[in-house]
A protein has these predicted regions:
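Structural signal for hydrophobic packing residues in well-ordered secondary-structure cores
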Residues: 76, 80, 97-104, 115, ...
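Residue-level signal for inorganic ion chemistry
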Residues: 51, 89, 111, 133, ...
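Rossmann-like NAD(P) dinucleotide-binding subdomain of oxidoreductase/dehydrogenase enzymes
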Residues: 145-287, 412
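Glycine-rich loop-to-alpha-helix module at the N-terminal edge of alpha/beta enzyme cores
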Residues: 54-143
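Conserved C-terminal structural/oligomerization subdomain of aldehyde/semialdehyde dehydrogenase
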Residues: 1, 52-55, 278, 332, ...
Length: 497
């Protein structure tokens, strides 16, 4: 279909992106080629900055999902990838990373158009995806076994082997980086893969699937089934999958886990968050303000680790909040592709309406809201950066994952009170401590119930750093050496001499 872009937006896109968008509607990518979906359902890809459709794709049916899983199973069982020398897998994945780097500008524009985030942020996302892919390419030749002490008539070893067919369901906020958290280690260790991106953001994943074929990844090793919730449900229910990795809401993660229980499929879940940033009076307040702003305004707050709760020493509350609001007013809210934009829209009208509703409920319950900027004069799904003060612990705005540019501020009286507030939600994905005292940083970090604690910084990710949550934020770790356990099985071999 011809992309229905607003003229101002069309002028911001490269000819390569426009050409790619003007192709016929995409369908599933199975066994090395694009297929015509067996479903008649077309899903529009919406530009969040204008509310206009830019292209469409065909939703994958349950039959398409079964075909993708079957292709992945055949590709695994015949060894076309798993039995290749580790050096070959490493070289192929490095070549794939090089191709992604060559097309980084195109993919970043697709990501910004699809998600609504500022182009500068989208470029960082693609850089992260490339870094993760290169990191795990190196792991293909680094997984080793051990010789186990045994009675002298026996030789016993333990070795790591690929699991088999891995599936991933990825979210709309960071489509390509989060796909790479799952796909890169899976392929490095010899597995095959089926990806189901969010129905709202398929463009970068679809582009990447084509790059896999160009890079020489054998047919059937990487498969893509775009679609909405029904497609994801079909994927989790399909026999023949050995591992499912899911990133998304806690509620959907629970559904994935229930479905996986029926087939005893291995699962890892990275779910919601309500991350606290604890600011003590002895902190570098200038740095802390910048850190709090980055933690909540990045990607318009649509981040699983968004630092959406500012827990601050009561003695510095007013001064800190006033300066934070002042700096936030300098942000430019606009279309993600516009050069001056540093805060974009939310991904959909539904997400915008949900965020606005939660803020309205907080106001009705007596909270004070500071709206820090005017909304752009267009049809996009914009919510202005919002600072909520005066909310009580336990209110929805303080407990629920808003997933928007909304910061709730809670004052504390002492360290124990700060920790009580910080740990007082169902979530435990990330947190931060801002303090000039090394002993306090260590002491507080130990007591925070979160998978990641940042101290005097926020949002630092790297391919080597394991990432995941506790409590309702899920289980399992991605990135770093932790992925070895998720994408390999340990085999013990005992030989009688």
């Amino acid at each position: 279909m011809t992309a229905q872009l607003a003229p101002a937006v069309r002028g911001l896109l490269s000819s390569s992106v426009l050409s790619w968008l003007d192709k016929p509607p995409l369908g599933p990518f199975i066994d090395g080629s694009w297929r015509t979906a067996r479903s008649d359902t077309l899903i529009d890809v919406i530009d969040p900055g204008t509310g206009l459709p830019v292209t469409a794709y065909a939703a994958s049916s349950a039959e398409d999902v079964a075909d993708a899983v079957a292709a992945a199973r055949t590709a695994f069982d015949d060894g076309r990838w798993s039995e290749q020398d580790p050096e070959v897998r490493e070289q192929t994945l490095r070549h794939l990373a090089d191709l992604l780097e060559q097309d980084a500008d195109v993919v970043a524009q697709l990501e910004a158009l699809d998600t609504g985030k500022p182009l500068a942020e989208a470029r960082l996302d693609i850089e992260e995806a490339i870094a993760v892919l290169r990191y795990y390419a190196g792991w293909a030749t680094k997984v080793e076994g051990t010789v186990i002490p045994a009675p002298r008539r026996f030789v016993a070893t333990s070795t790591r082997e690929a699991i088999g067919v891995c599936a991933a369901i990825t979210p709309w906020n960071y489509p390509l980086p989060i796909l790479m958290y799952k796909l890169a280690p899976a392929l490095a260790f010899g597995n095959t893969f089926v990806a189901k991106p969010s129905e709202q953001t398929v463009l970068s994943t679809a582009y990447f699937a084509q790059l896999c074929a160009t890079a020489g990844i054998p047919d059937g090793v990487v498969n893509l089934v775009p679609g909405a919730g029904a497609t994801g449900a079909a994927l989790t229910a399909t026999q023949g999958i050995d591992k499912i990795a899911f990133t998304g809401s806690t509620r959907t993660g629970q559904a994935v886990m229930r479905a996986a229980a029926d087939t005893l499929t291995k699962v890892s879940l990275e779910l919601g968050g309500k991350s606290p940033q604890l600011v003590f009076s002895d902190a570098d307040l200038d740095a802390a303000i910048d850190g709090v702003m980055g933690g909540i305004w990045t990607n318009a707050g649509q981040v699983c680790v968004a630092g959406s709760r500012l827990i601050i020493d009561r003695r510095i509350h007013d001064e800190f909040v006033a300066e934070l609001v002042s700096r936030t007013r300098r942000l430019n809210l606009g279309h993600g592709l516009a050069p001056a934009t540093n805060l974009g829209p939310l991904v959909s009208a539904a997400q915008r309406d949900r965020v606005v509703s939660l803020v309205d409920q907080a106001v009705a319950a007596g909270a004070h809201v500071e709206i820090t900027s005017e909304l752009p004069d267009d049809r996009g799904f914009f919510v202005a950066p919002t600072v909520v003060t005066g909310a009580r612990p336990g209110q929805s705005i303080e407990q629920e994952e808003v997933f928007g540019p909304v910061l709730t501020v809670l004052p504390f009286d002492d360290e124990d009170h700060a920790l009580q507030l910080a740990n007082g939600t169902d979530y435990g994905l990330a947190s931060a401590v801002w303090s000039g005292s090394a002993s306090r940083v260590h002491r507080v970090s130990r007591r925070l119930r979160a998978g990641t604690v940042w101290a005097n910084t926020y949002g630092v990710f790297h391919p080597t750093l394991p990432f995941g949550g506790v409590k309702a934020s899920g289980f399992g770790r991605e990135l770093g050496s932790a992925a070895v356990d998720h994408y390999t099985e340990l085999k013990t071999t005992v030989i009688d001499l």
